[in-house]
């Protein structure tokens, strides 16, 4: 598995390169600009959501767009090259920003690929929950890293909840579920980080943070 291979490499490097004793602390939470945009749509009418049609599964690649009060906001999942837990790695990172109509088109150009799909909502956004995961990585010498990141968001309207999340640190697919309790479709955090090399392990936690309770 990918995690096992890279973490095993990190463990060997940590033994051979004794001069580098830094613990990596990687923070990929939402930026203030993302939080401000999320706050803005609470109390507003969510007219519709635009995403890829569910062709290969219930996900949209890289982007989901939200039409709110004649404005458009977008949940993006883009790769960033990071000095990650076990070395240089491309890691997918969420953002939530205002965008233009031209930015809402699917990333695909193949005619056989999924087409954009617009789902009508026409409900008031009552609350937004940010899902943050924290991974504390250990080897035989102790903790060597911590990775805190946005796993997804839940948008609560008058009648439903809409949940958007990613399933791996490296992929750019945004999974989508809706209903009364859509987060039951999300994978457990421990199942996503359970493939460490011998001598390595992680302590994992997931937090659900209401947008109204975030203090600047």
Model feature map: region roles:
Residues 2-3, 7, 12:
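Short hydrophobic transmembrane-like helices used for membrane targeting/insertion
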Residues 23-216:
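Surface-exposed, interaction-prone regions used to assemble/regulate multi-protein complexes
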Residues 1-2, 23:
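Accessible peptide chain termini
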């Amino acid at each position: 598995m990918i995690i096992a291979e890279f973490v095993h490499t990190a463990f060997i490097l940590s033994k051979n390169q004794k001069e580098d004793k830094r613990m990596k602390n990687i923070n990929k939470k939402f930026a203030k600009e993302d939080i401000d945009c999320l706050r803005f749509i609470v109390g507003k009418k969510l007219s519709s959501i635009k995403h890829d049609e569910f062709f290969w599964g219930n996900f949209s690649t890289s982007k989901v767009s939200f039409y709110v009060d004649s404005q458009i906001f977008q949940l993006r999942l883009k790769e960033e090259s990071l000095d990650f837990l076990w070395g240089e790695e491309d890691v997918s990172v969420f953002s939530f920003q205002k965008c233009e109509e031209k930015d809402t088109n699917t990333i695909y150009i193949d005619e056989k690929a999924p087409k954009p799909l617009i789902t009508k909502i026409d409900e008031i956004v009552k609350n937004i929950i940010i899902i943050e995961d924290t991974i504390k990585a250990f080897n035989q010498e102790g903790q060597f890293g911590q990775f805190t990141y946005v796993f997804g968001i839940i948008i609560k309207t008058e009648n439903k909840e809409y949940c958007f999340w990613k399933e791996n640190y490296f992929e750019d697919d945004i999974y989508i579920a809706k209903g009364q309790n859509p987060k039951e479709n999300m994978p457990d955090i421990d199942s996503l980080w359970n493939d460490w090399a011998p001598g390595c392990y992680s302590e994992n936690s997931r937090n659900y943070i209401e947008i109204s309770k975030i203090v600047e």
